[in-house]
A protein has these predicted regions:
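Conserved lysine of the Walker
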Residues: 38
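Hydrophobic anchor at the beta1->P-loop junction of P-loop NTPases
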Residues: 28-30
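Short beta-strand-centered segment that lines the nucleotide-binding/catalytic pocket of NTP-utilizing
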Residues: 51-66
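Phosphate-binding P-loop
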Residues: 19-25
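P-loop (Walker A) phosphate-binding loop of NTP-binding proteins
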Residues: 33
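Short phosphate-coordinating micro-motif centered on Lys-Gly-acidic
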Residues: 1, 82-85, 91-147
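N-terminal pre-Walker A segment at the start of P-loop NTPase domains
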Residues: 1-17
Length: 147
């Protein structure tokens, strides 16, 4: 499904709609250029779970926000040029049953966690604040997913 947003607050609201449909063991993969809105979308997702103060974990790779469920925000950008074992060594799969994951730059790594995930690609739109999102539901868990 393709979605267009024209402002930062629309991206945040879209994230909240996505987040309202998530449950433990769900994984959302975000791909897009730097500054495309991945973190804003993540902030919206987290807001639907009652979380605030979400920042990009670029330099620390991941942030675990404890709760029921846990919310794990991963920025895998720094791992893109490394081996897959560097991602698996971080042992995220042990958190999967009780956590919701959002993984920026996660396409090369998602298969180590699950074969069912929501894949969102974000591209620049026609103006500075507009973005186009291509949302692909992968696996049976996501059948019937709609926004």
């Amino acid at each position: 499904m393709k979605i267009s947003v024209n402002a930062v607050d629309q991206m945040h609201q879209l994230g909240a709609k996505i987040g309202a449909q998530l449950k433990p063991s769900d994984v959302v993969v975000l791909t897009g250029d730097l500054g495309s809105g991945k973190t804003v979308l993540t902030q919206g997702i987290a807001s639907s779970l009652g979380l605030s103060d979400i920042t990009s974990p670029t330099f620390v790779i991941s942030r675990i926000h404890k709760g029921t469920p846990n919310f794990i925000h991963i920025d895998a950008y720094r791992l893109l040029d490394s081996s897959l074992s560097n991602f698996t060594d971080l042992d995220f799969e042990s958190y999967l049953p009780n956590s919701i994951f959002v993984i920026e730059w996660g396409a090369p790594f998602v298969a180590t966690l699950t074969d069912q995930y929501l894949d969102i690609k974000i591209t620049q739109g026609e103006n500075e604040n507009s973005r186009s999102l291509e949302v692909t539901a992968v696996g049976q868990r996501w059948q019937g997913f709609n926004l």
